[in-house]
Amino acid sequence: MGKIRKLDDQLSNKIAAGEVVERPASVVKELVENAVDANSTIIEIELEEAGLTKIRVIDNGDGMEEDDCLVAFERHATSKIKDEHDLFRIRTLGFRGEALPSIASVSEVEMKTSTGDGPGTKVVLKGGKLVVHERTTSRKGTDITVSNLFFNTPARLKYMKTIHTELGHVTDVVNRLAMAHPDISFRLRHHGKQLLYTSGNGDVRHVLAAIYGMDVAKKMIPIQAESLDFTVQGYISLPEVTRASRNYISTIVNGRYVRNIPLAKAIEAGYHTLLPIGRYPIVFLSIAMDPILVDVNVHPAKLEVRFSKEAELNELVTQAIRQALQARTLIPEMMIKQKETPKPKAEQTAWTFEHVVKEPFVSPLVHVDEPKQVDEPKQSSPVQEPKEEIPSFLPTVESKQNDVDDELVEMDEQTESSDEQEHVNDRLPPLYPIGQMHGTYILAQNERGLYIIDQHAAQERIKYEYFREKVGEVINEVQELLVPLTFHYPTDEYVLIDAHREELAKCGVFLEPFGHNTFIVRSHPSWFPKGEEAEIIEEMIQQVIDMKKVDMKQLREKAAILMSCKRSIKANEYLRDDEIFALLESLRKTTDPFTCPHGRPIIIHFSTYELEKMFKRVM
């Protein structure tokens, strides 16, 4: 008898579950995506023990007929695609037909579903085996409960993380689905406590406010770009709002949350020199394209995708972000935190919106009532919204009107006023120096308030933009060295450097072989920082050694940043009045006067009104 045998369906489903059902968050993702594909407008998720004990997903979607109920738990059974042609034009979130049988094989599943046209159907499966099949109520939609996850695979259960960690993964999944589908109302509860509520009014800004909070949402600006193949729109945070990981970058392709490293790098490239090292923006991008241009059938989890025109898409995204940021004044506003009145807890509050604000919003300012003593822009009166009753399939507390709509209306008005001002003034308004603090910070003022400028960061930005233009230019003027510089390297490094002498020469480093494993430099461009020649050349050579593949654009960029750091004004260096004036004027002429090349802020602003509040001149 042969050694090779065909595995039975139950064992095959358990093996498939190893890829599809990694943790409770995987189950939530698959069930909620099914609800989205079923044209639901309200989706409720209830958890116990972060989903390990119980996951319940209720929707008001199309539901299933009795025959489909049983077939749905068979492997590779799906209503999403019919033939090979459909596989290359996928418009639904699910399509593989693996999720339900995989989930059922490692848990206990109870599903009630109905199309609303007749009696519903109830099925119960344990470990993939059908134990109950009967008629039930006819409420349209699906109510599916997954209990005792991994009860028959204890090895998998043993490797689950803490409840807090697993709950974090579930929340992350639901948050991204909510951002991808702002027209659906999502409600997430854990042991009855509400963790997320979105109104489903179609405005993604409301979803961003629900997830990240109003303070962050108010510091996110809209972006939009379009090409022949792609449409990109979304919201990006101002450079002053950052996080320590890329996990806050959400990219949605045709309604599906995806991970794509080149796309994430394209987003970061749009913030070039605007963010400190190790800090990342908060980004929501929704990208629409012909399904044939993206392959979502790369991994069973359907998170990783491949694009047919990846370079074109990445360039479009980078330029869209860059243009949106270049149109803004990126000076961080220093705000005085107000004492807030106690607010209802998350589980006691639901948001209802009927009015949808469609204009883009941008405002780094927190709303404050206008005091009579200070001439501030007039604020709009609160918009009174009629309450909208939202049906719920589970017992919920009474919904209360939230002030998010009012704040978004206000932000739109502030944006219009700000945009008008942008056309009148440069990105950095004229500043009038009034002093220097600790030989490190320049104090300046204008009619808008007080500005504090980091003098070292300011000169770094000025020099960086100067050297960025110089590095890579045709070098006509060179400075001969009175004493040539020599550099000795091990054989492996010498061979590597010698292979890239042409690229180094384009950056102003003129190397000539000079004996065994040695190079000599006899001249350099006239714009090289004086007194720093040896150190700069050595560090430029080191960049080539460290690069796995020498990229000229990246090499020039590193050269410009390196040179901008040399001989810039340092801390504890006192400047004359004329030097301060010259520095500020030079800063105004730069393209990005708000951060140094390393992403640190150059300037911060205290408005006159905020200063008045500090001294209790206004209340």
From Swiss-Prot:
Keywords: DNA damage, DNA repair. GO terms for biological process: mismatch repair. The keyword Mitochondrion does not apply. SUPFAM superfamilies: ATPase domain of HSP90 chaperone/DNA topoisomerase II/histidine kinase, DNA mismatch repair protein MutL, Ribosomal protein S5 domain 2-like. GO terms for cellular component: mismatch repair complex. The keyword DNA repair applies. GO terms for molecular function: ATP binding; ATP hydrolysis activity; ATP-dependent DNA damage sensor activity; mismatched DNA binding. Residues 368-378 have a biased composition (Basic and acidic residues). InterPro entries: DNA_mismatch_repair_CS, DNA_mismatch_repair_MutL, DNA_mismatch_S5_2-like, HATPase_C_sf, MutL/Mlh/PMS, MutL/Mlh/Pms-like, MutL_C, MutL_C_dimsub. Transmembrane segments: none annotated. Gene3D superfamilies: 3.30.230.10, Histidine kinase-like ATPase, C-terminal domain, MutL, C-terminal domain, dimerisation subdomain, MutL, C-terminal domain, regulatory subdomain. This protein is involved in the repair of mismatches in DNA. It is required for dam-dependent methyl-directed DNA mismatch repair. May act as a 'molecular matchmaker', a protein that promotes the formation of a stable complex between two or more DNA-binding proteins in an ATP-dependent manner without itself being part of a final effector complex. Belongs to the DNA mismatch repair MutL/HexB family. This is DNA mismatch repair protein MutL. It comes from Geobacillus sp. (strain WCH70). The lineage of its organism: Bacteria, Bacillati, Bacillota, Bacilli, Bacillales.
